[in-house]
Amino acid sequence: MIHSNKVATVVLALISSWPADGTNNHGLKLQKAQAICKMSKELKATAMRAANDAKLKITEILELENVFAAMIPNATKGTEADGCTDYNAVFLEANNTAAETVSKIATLAESATKAAGAAGRAAGVLDEFIAALAQAQGATGLYCIQGSGTGAATHTELADCFNGDLKPRNMLSIRDPKVSAAATGSTDLTTLAKAMAASGTDTTFHGDQQSKGCGLMKGTSDGIMIGQALTGTFAWAQGLLRFGALGANGIASTGVTGYAHTATASGNGVHWASDPEKIPVIAEAIALVSNYNTLADSIGTRAKDAIEKVKKCMKATNKEIKREHIFLNVSHLNRELQKAVTELDKALNKQDAKAEAKQQPNCDDKKQIECGDTPGCGWHKAEGKCEAKDGEGQKNQATGEKDANKNRCTQHGTNKEACEKENTPGQSAVCGFRKGKDGETDEPDKEKCRNGSFLTSKQFAFSVVSAAFMALLF
């Protein structure tokens, strides 16, 4: 009996000397849980970072459009002292940068949305895993995440996951100050993912305290199922942790083994993924964030740099260049003006062609009877000859007055001297001895006496268009 007591005393002494990990092996080791929480926080920060970065870049691109719109050729130019040594070079650079970056706005916004969404989804998967284990605490002191001592992990020890007690409602949101602070920096998601495999793996489960193990990580009949063992592999967080049904005593003293996240968990072991960066939800986040970073880097600070150069050249370093609607549309207005002038020119040409066709009939050399039968002709008794009736002729389209000069000029034909006598010194020329202008269909290549009102109507039309454009500018 005394001998038995001595044996019992020795056994108790040995048990009390075992390290906390062995004696209180209730589940997930603190270092592993902390690595998972850090990954989750950084994924949320990455989502915020992508959204903020895209917003900033798009704002800069639109601002570049704004300031460049004011950089018109006749604007006040900077000098070398203003940091603008070559105005034209800055103008061209700003134009090219604006065109290239504006074309990327839609793609940038789409890429940022995908990256942020994937990072947020991956963080959610890890949060669900940690939340389930953190809440698993029994009345007799059992738990699924061990703290730094012999008790369960606290929210302070899991600060990258929780802001209060270990409840899902207290997990860090994307708007949490901790996430915002992390979003101001940069991180390598692949490195953080691999850290989940390395942290707290080798000594997480060992010893012979299986009866105290976390049931959420055991596949035997006294584990995650009631009264029966699993029929296959159970996976947490898309394979971050896996365990199977074999082994009557649950977790063996051989500890945790590391296999690919897709491997089947056989035997007594609990398998941590040796390749967390390849877990589908994490791999997707890493890939889409990388895609966004590549696109964002192609834009970089180009728009911002161009803005500063433009402001210097516009002598606006210390003031905001306001958006002027007319300047934003200078090119458009020029095109529309040219189009309007072309259309007006065509219309005038058609009118002149009709006028030529409707010019007064030739009444010369007609006898009295024939003259009376010819429309537009009448017999002049005093002179005894056939002449055009008074009031015939086409109206001037610009002034609305009758153009009685057409026949007056054309009757002289190639007689230059007679043509020029029709003009009164000091007054606008009535006739001109010249070749035909654009739109004149009557022998345009031949020099002869022609009506001067053709140019008058076109000059009036151009003056109307010019006045309208100047009204827009001022």
From Swiss-Prot:
Record region (Disordered): 388-449
Primary residence: membrane
Keywords on record: Cell membrane, Disulfide bond, Glycoprotein, GPI-anchor, Lipoprotein, Membrane, Signal, Trypanosomiasis
Organism: Trypanosoma brucei brucei
Source superkingdom: Eukaryota
Residues linked to a lipid group, GPI-anchor amidated asparagine type: N451
Keyword Signal attached: yes
UniProt name for this protein: Variant surface glycoprotein MITAT 1.5
